[in-house]
């Protein structure tokens, strides 16, 4: 592997007072981090409406401005270093935001981040999206842009970062307060400070592919280095953290190794510092001893990728310390002219504030004036220590680097015709006030009930809505809500209208799922029993039909004339039912349509709901400068891609098989694109048609399904479908770029949704 790391000059190391025994390195092109870091700060503050300063660029004498990632990942691939820098600064700025935000604000940010991190390509995740303003959606676009940048560079390793970040997010945000020793503290702090994420960022940055089993083998050795990073971070961040705590009434106690030692070990602040100095040295020494032992087991040397991984862990320790010495993010006690801190009666305070306190003392002066031997002797003989350094100092590492022209004319005509009668139409509602009250009871509204999911959860257990409530408990990818939010980034629909449109689309989608499962004889939905298997076919048909009544009630809430909304809904629902009729006809008669007819069916069936969504959003849009823009070609391509991808994944995806069963479309007798291509090409067409025509109700025998899939592979139908999907992927991105240009804004959220569905 090429080397990009360069040793930091000896004179710079010497003047820094570095304690680490490892040799610090810096990226040979470390200056490329400066602009990404500054840009991320601006990007974050604009998205979050904050005025935070990351202070991640340290002015190191002899080097100039250096970002922590250039020291912690000195051998990072140059083309990946800017993206790593931006992501690291995002995590750091987010940490600062948590310090000033309310808990409900923090939880919302975390929820948005989790949604951005979820892998939408795997069925089974459960997401919820609430309608929001442009201000609310800006953070989501920022998060999506960061994830997208990493995925574009290396999707596999990027998803490892996202998975680790998602798993540790709650611990990183809300640290526990029941850790009494450093042995308890260190492992938790390692996660809290983002070092597990940093480990995946290292692999991404350097392009290292290390198996989970090899990472597990290396973990004890690497964790020792990570614990040393935590000690370094806690030592240098303590003055800032305790200052913030003491000056912020009601704030949480600092989650810091110094605090653990003072609160639960009975140590003074200087004693806690001395213990942590000794602990850093001990951790580094034990790391080297265990590394030597591991190498001996492996014949004297680890494989190159593993050696690079461990080497980076060492450089991260000393790099973290060198950066901490000079960064403005961590002013020293001397910089702050901060008195010694003590812990008395369950609270921290400055010694100068205590009764009979003497002169202010700066801890850095008192600690550094003691010889190393005195530090070690005092620690080893201290009666306050319940055990060894290991017992007292088990502190987890805290990394400082973690971060339609025709369509519009049509709508305009309708609006003009009904402008004078709009109020009358609304007054002459098709639904009586009594009926509307009944509907409101079945799907309640009110404070806190801002999403379709929350309204369903609050709905009564009435038979007419029970199948819908059941569907809401099943896993969902949430793609439609994300799609609506992403389009709204361009169209700027009022919040109440956006919420209503999401509800309408969700209602119609649920209705179609219930009816589809009945019409397709499906017994499973997302790995669970289909609704009609629980509530009965007749009851589910009634519930699905009742949804249309509720949709009419929701349409009345929109700001555009009711006649416009009803016209749009009627036209697109007609398309949906026409498409479904073709699909059912081909299945019942085992009739193989042409590829063109199949595409038209998808455009009607799948595209109907997408177009309904887009047209309602356009009708409610507050923008007047985009009336001549037409997103329908993009929507058509997206609909085709969604359905054909589903056809393909149903036959080849292990994840789909786990959720739905192997080749479930064949159980239903569905005429999908791979089946059409197979029947057009295979010499065994008569045999396959025979299997399909003589299929009995219920699942197809596994041997028959395996036979048909083998024939698909032999004749190239599956490969042709895959190639078609890959071409569609390129067309979708090209169409997205056109729309971004027309609307005048990038749409990272929409692109991320697309790319996570890609077929490789």
Swiss-Prot record:
Listed GO biological process terms: alcohol biosynthetic process; isoprenoid biosynthetic process; mycotoxin biosynthetic process
Catalytic activity: 5 isopentenyl diphosphate + dimethylallyl diphosphate = all-trans-hexaprenyl diphosphate + 5 diphosphate; all-trans-hexaprenyl diphosphate + H2O = colleterpenol + diphosphate
Residues reported to bind Mg(2+) 3: 516, 520
Gene Ontology MF term list: lyase activity; metal ion binding; prenyltransferase activity
Binding site for dimethylallyl diphosphate: 525, 605-606, 643, 650, 660, 670
UniProt cross-references to InterPro entries, sorted A to Z: Isoprenoid_synthase_dom_sf, Polyprenyl_synt, Polyprenyl_synt_CS
Residue ranges, annotated region (Terpene cyclase): 14-335
This protein's UniProt keywords: Isoprene biosynthesis, Lyase, Magnesium, Metal-binding, Multifunctional enzyme, Repeat, Transferase
Family per similarity comment: In the N-terminal section; belongs to the terpene synthase family.
Binding partners and assembly: Hexamer.
Protein's UniProt name: Colleterpenol synthase
């Amino acid at each position: 592997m090429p080397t990009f790391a360069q040793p930091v000059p000896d004179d710079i190391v010497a003047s820094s007072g570095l304690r680490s025994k490892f040799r610090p390195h810096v990226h040979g092109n470390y200056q490329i981090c400066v602009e990404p870091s500054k840009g991320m700060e601006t990007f974050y503050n604009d998205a979050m409406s904050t005025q935070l300063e990351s202070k991640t660029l340290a002015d190191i004498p002899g080097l100039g401005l250096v970002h922590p990632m250039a020291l912690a990942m000195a051998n990072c691939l140059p083309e990946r270093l800017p993206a790593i820098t931006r992501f690291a600064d995002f995590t750091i700025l987010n940490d600062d935001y948590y310090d000033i935000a309310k808990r409900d604000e923090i939880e919302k940010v975390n929820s948005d981040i989790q949604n951005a991190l979820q892998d939408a390509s795997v069925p089974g995740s459960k997401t919820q999206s609430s309608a929001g303003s442009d201000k609310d959606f800006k953070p989501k676009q920022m998060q999506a842009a960061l994830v997208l940048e990493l995925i574009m560079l290396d999707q596999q390793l990027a998803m490892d970062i996202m998975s680790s970040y998602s798993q540790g997010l709650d611990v990183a945000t809300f640290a526990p307060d029941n850790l009494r020793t450093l042995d308890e503290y260190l492992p938790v702090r390692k996660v809290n400070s983002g070092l597990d994420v940093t480990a995946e960022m290292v692999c991404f940055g350097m392009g290292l592919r290390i198996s989970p089993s090899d990472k597990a083998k290396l973990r004890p050795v690497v964790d020792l280095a990570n614990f040393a990073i935590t000690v370094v971070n806690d030592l240098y961040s303590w003055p800032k953290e305790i200052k913030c705590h003491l000056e912020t009434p009601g704030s949480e106690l600092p989650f810091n190794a110094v605090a653990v030692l003072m609160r639960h070990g009975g140590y003074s602040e200087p004693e806690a510092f001395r213990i942590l100095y000794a602990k850093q040295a001990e951790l580094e020494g034990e790391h080297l001893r265990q590394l030597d032992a591991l190498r001996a087991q492996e014949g004297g040397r680890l494989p190159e990728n593993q050696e690079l991984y461990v080497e980076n862990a060492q450089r991260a320790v000393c790099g973290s310390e060198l950066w901490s010495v000079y960064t403005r993010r961590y002013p020293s006690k001397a910089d702050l002219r901060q008195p010694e801190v003590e812990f008395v009666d369950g609270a921290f305070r400055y010694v100068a504030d205590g009764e009979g306190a003497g002169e202010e003392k700066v801890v850095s002066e008192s600690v550094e004036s003691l010889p190393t031997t005195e530090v070690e002797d005092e620690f080893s003989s201290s009666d306050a220590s319940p055990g060894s350094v290991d017992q007292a100092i088990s502190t987890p590492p805290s990394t400082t680097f973690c971060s339609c022209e025709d369509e519009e004319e049509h709508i305009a005509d309708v609006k003009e015709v009904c402008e004078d009668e709009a109020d009358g139409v609304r007054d002459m509602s098709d639904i009586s006030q009594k009926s509307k009250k009944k509907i409101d009871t079945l799907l309640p509204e009110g404070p806190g009930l801002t999403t379709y999911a929350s309204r369903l959860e609050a709905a009564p257990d009435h038979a007419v809505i029970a199948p819908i409530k059941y569907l809401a408990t099943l896993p969902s990818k949430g793609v439609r809500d994300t799609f609506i939010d992403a389009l709204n980034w361009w169209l700027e629909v009022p919040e109440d209208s956006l919420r209503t449109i999401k509800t309408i689309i969700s209602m119609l989608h649920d209705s179609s799922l219930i009816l589809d499962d009945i019409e397709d004889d499906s017994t499973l939905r997302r790995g669970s029993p289909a609704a009609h298997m629980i509530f009965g076919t007749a009851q589910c048909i009634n519930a699905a039909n009742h949804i249309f009544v509720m949709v009419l009630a929701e349409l009345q809430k929109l700001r555009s004339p009711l006649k416009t909304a009803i016209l749009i809904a009627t036209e697109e629902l007609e398309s949906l039912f026409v498409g479904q009729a073709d699909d059912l006809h081909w299945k019942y008669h085992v009739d193989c349509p042409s590829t063109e007819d199949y595409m038209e069916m998808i455009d009607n069936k799948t595209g109907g709901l997408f177009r309904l969504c887009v047209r309602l959003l356009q009708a409610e849009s507050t923008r007047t400068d985009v009336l001549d823009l037409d997103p329908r070609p993009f929507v058509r391509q997206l609909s085709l891609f969604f359905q054909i991808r589903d056809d393909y994944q149903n036959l080849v995806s292990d994840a789909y098989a786990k959720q739905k069963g192997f080749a479930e479309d064949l159980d239903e007798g569905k005429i999908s694109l791979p089946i059409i291509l197979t029947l057009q090409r295979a010499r065994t067409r008569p045999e396959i048609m025979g299997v399909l025509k003589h299929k009995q109700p219920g699942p197809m025998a596994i041997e028959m399904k395996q036979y048909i899939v083998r024939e698909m592979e032999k004749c190239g139908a599956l490969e042709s479908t895959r190639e078609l999907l890959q071409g569609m992927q390129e067309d979708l991105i090209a169409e997205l770029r056109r729309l971004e240009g027309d609307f005048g804004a990038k749409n990272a959220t929409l692109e991320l949704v697309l790319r996570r569905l890609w077929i490789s």
